[in-house]
Design a protein with these regions (language model features):
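Feature recognizes metal-dependent phosphohydrolase scaffolds
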Residues: 1-657
Length: 657
């Protein structure tokens, strides 16, 4: 066999890890065994909008997968009430365990029964994994015993006696609680191989910061950014406009816990400024939306701050629009179109009276200029966002594990839309002198979004990237937004409902056509019956009969209303998707009451399941992206074995096998 210099160099590098024929052959055999296993379960979620309790519950329950495993393993032999208790214990072991213990008359017997049930369940969920993989999932401090309990063979000894003796030792040495908790965590770990979050972790919900904590602790997760995410990414990067934008949303819902409690960002200077500047103003239009879960506090103070940051936001929007003509947002620099004496605005040729004409900080001769006090507030907030260690960790995680889109195991994941023309062609959007569409546009947006955080501080490239992050939040041709305009100004200042309409991109009309879904998949290099698009962003109005399944079953929108504000519009509380070795399962969820009720009353989210794609045969690891990489490694290892056997590369010292 002839070897190129490059191939030989690679094989020599590979030989450093696999130093003998035996070592390389053993790895080939190990990989071939892995490739024959069923593919792992993938879990898809989208549009979390800060609803951390519902998110954590669905994450812990794996959208009902764990309860299904419990019912399969324990069946009718265990009462439904006890199965529900066991499910809650697995979801929330640290919180549920003390409550269950307090109820027991014979704690020793309960420990024994619970550990046996958890062992059986854990053996079941680990059955589609190699023993080596399961071992890597076990906690170090008790991994050996867990491994023994999971992989013991009973051909020559009694199972009940073997388990019984080990469990007795665990209980005797006061380790039962620790082992129960570890088993619960391992079951959740093995039930789902990969988590996909298709955007919008941030928004109006009570604690988006707590949502980010969970993916950061997850073993394998990817995120496709939503427009609510990129504006927070821009804020963390140091964009004053993105900061004012996230503050506006936060204050509109009086959600100060996220900023002050979650990220340690003080709004004291802003509060003093707003109190002084708008002390005599009517701020009734600026009162926060009611949500009993967010801090009550002084609503008038929140309203004043809401108005203060909105005016600063409008000024900064005008500045960004002026220095980015290719955003094509001319006319949306509204402060430049207001007649302050008359109290009207020229809105694209129509003159409207303003619902609020009070602009004490605006200079009519230079409406976009911040006052000296506003400059100080903006600078302090930029510094506070930059110095929030927790926020920076969260945003760095979003950049490291997130992207504009992802292709995984034949599926295409993105949050918003592929911009289209009225006739269904990919719309060509021009930035920096070049028109791009489809995948090329997505790749460009991904690069510009990273530029806003990673380019050198103070550089023109970083400023341009931060401006682009704001454009991705609300731009008319932003693939993450997908509407004609974000009508924040119109809803606050103009009474005419016609001015408040946000027209959806033609994409949302064309995705009903199977040819559109297939066209998008081909654009990203995907094809075949098993390839699907997983999309979010636009809540599906299930209450009106709308289906989340579009494009002849090739596109699934899984934004069904995680956000509580959308429940009335959608009629449900969200969709999730499960992709296992049998196919794709859509889960439709009803509203979630609270974690407290789930823990103390064993209340689970009511859900229904629907297979939307059934694989013609069971999907194995060899059929996945990882399987493709493993098969490539087998080819390389086979070439290495041949190189050893032909004497092209010398074997190292044989290790004991």
């Amino acid at each position: 066999m002839q070897y190129s210099d490059e191939h030989l160099r690679y094989l020599r590098l590979l030989s450093q890890k696999y130093q003998t024929v035996a070592a390389a052959a053993s790895e080939i055999i190990r990989i071939e065994a892995l490739l024959r296993l069923p593919k792992g379960t993938e879990h898809f979620m989208s549009d979390l909008h800060g609803e951390h309790e519902a998110f954590v519950h669905i994450l812990n329950s794996a959208s009902g997968v764990i309860r299904e495993k419990i019912d399969t393993v324990l069946g009718n032999g265990v009462p439904a009430e006890e199965r529900a208790e066991l499910a809650t214990l697995i979801y929330y072991p640290n919180q549920k365990l003390p409550e269950l213990k307090a109820r027991q008359r014979d704690l020793h017997a309960w420990y024994r029964m619970t550990l046996l049930r958890l062992i059986d369940l854990c053996r079941f969920v680990s059955s589609k994994h190699t023993r080596d993989h399961v071992r890597r999932c076990l906690p170090q401090n008790c991994g050996y015993i867990l491994d023994e309990l999971l992989h013991a063979h009973f051909e020559d000894h009694d199972k009940d006696q073997y388990y019984g003796e080990i469990i007795e030792s665990i209980i005797r040495y006061d380790r039962a609680d620790a082992y129960i908790i570890r088993f619960c965590e391992v079951i959740k770990r093995l039930a789902v191989d990969r988590l996909h979050i298709v955007g919008d972790l941030f928004d109006r919900g009570p604690r988006p910061d707590r949502i980010l904590d969970s993916p950061m602790a997850h073993h394998q997760v990817d995120i496709q950014w939503g427009n609510h995410d990129v504006v927070w990414m821009g804020a963390a990067a140091g964009s004053p406009l993105c900061i004012m934008t996230v503050l506006k949303t936060t204050l509109a819902y009086n959600n100060l816990d996220t900023l002050e409690g979650g990220y340690g960002i003080s709004l004291r200077r802003l509060e003093r400024f707003a109190q002084h500047t708008y002390a005599d103003s009517d701020v009734s239009r600026w009162l926060p939306h009611a949500d009993q879960r967010t801090a009550a506090g002084d609503l008038t103070a929140a309203a004043r701050m809401h108005k203060a940051v909105t005016v600063m936001m409008l000024k900064l929007e005008a500045q960004v629009i002026a220095r980015n003509p290719d955003f094509d947002l001319q006319g949306r620099d509204f402060l430049n179109h207001i007649d302050f004496a008359a109290g009207t605005v020229d809105y694209f040729g129509t003159t409207y009276p303003l619902l609020d004409c009070d602009f004490p900080t605006v200079d009519p001769a230079n409406p976009a200029a911040l006052t000296a006090d506003e400059e100080k507030i903006a600078a302090e907030l930029v510094r506070s966002f930059a110095e929030s260690e927790r926020l920076q960790r969260h945003v760095q995680f979003l950049y490291a594990h997130g992207a504009f889109y992802k292709m995984c195991n034949g599926n295409l994941l993105y949050h918003g839309a592929v911009p289209m023309t009225e006739d269904g062609a990919f719309a060509a959007i021009r930035f920096e002198g070049t028109a791009r569409s489809g995948k090329q546009l997505f790749d460009y947006c991904d690069r510009r979004a990273r530029q806003g955080y990673s380019a050198p501080a103070g550089s023109p490239a970083r400023l341009a990237g931060q401006d682009f992050l704001w454009y991705l939040w609300c731009g008319a041709k932003s693939p993450l937004f997908g509407r004609s305009a974000m009508t924040t100004f119109e809803r606050l200042y103009i009474a005419d409902p016609a001015a408040q309409v946000e027209i959806k991109d033609p994409y949302y009309r064309h995705i009903a056509d199977p040819r559109t879904a297939e066209h998008i998949l081909r654009e990203f290099g995907l094809s075949g019956e098993g390839s699907h698009i997983v999309n979010g962003h636009v809540p599906v109005r299930a209450i009106e009969g709308e289906s989340p399944i579009k494009g002849g079953g090739r596109l699934i929108i899984i934004d069904g209303g995680f956000c509580r504000a959308y429940h009335r519009r959608t009629g449900i509380a969200g969709y999730t998707l499960v992709y296992n070795s049998r196919g794709l399962i859509l889960r439709t969820h009803q509203p979630f009451e609270s974690v407290d009720k789930a823990i103390h009353e064993d209340e689970d989210i009511a859900s229904k399941s629907e297979y939307i794609y059934t694989a013609p045969q069971r999907i194995l690891v060899r059929d996945t992206d990882e399987g493709g990489r493993k098969q490539a490694l087998i080819r390389d290892l086979t070439a290495l074995v041949e190189a050893y056997q032909s004497g092209v590369i010398a074997q190292g010292v044989a290790q004991e096998m």
